[in-house]
Design a protein with these regions (language model features):
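Compact, glycine-rich, soluble single-domain proteins
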Residues: 1-76
Length: 76
């Protein structure tokens, strides 16, 4: 199933299909190694749900929900 990265449940994994963010954010994500084909896991979500910690390639980063909505993944 394909969905936005923001729809992954805690502990769920997905493979990045495309990143439709602005150029600046896309460049920062690519520098961390978040590119199409990357396996990503949802690790933590703040109580309000506005920020989520994601783990991929041995790295953990936090992204805002509005940015995650622009990243398409295939759920595993």
């Amino acid at each position: 199933m394909e969905t936005g990265l923001d729809c992954l449940r805690l502990g769920q994994k997905g493979t990045v299909l495309e990143i439709n963010t602005d150029q600046s954010l896309r460049g920062r994500l690519q520098a961390f190694g978040l590119i199409p084909g990357t396996l990503v896991c949802c690790r933590y979500r703040t109580p309000g749900g506005s920020v989520t910690a994601l783990e991929f390639r041995g790295t953990v980063i936090a992204l805002r929900t509005r940015d995650m909505q622009k990243i398409r993944v295939r759920c595993l």
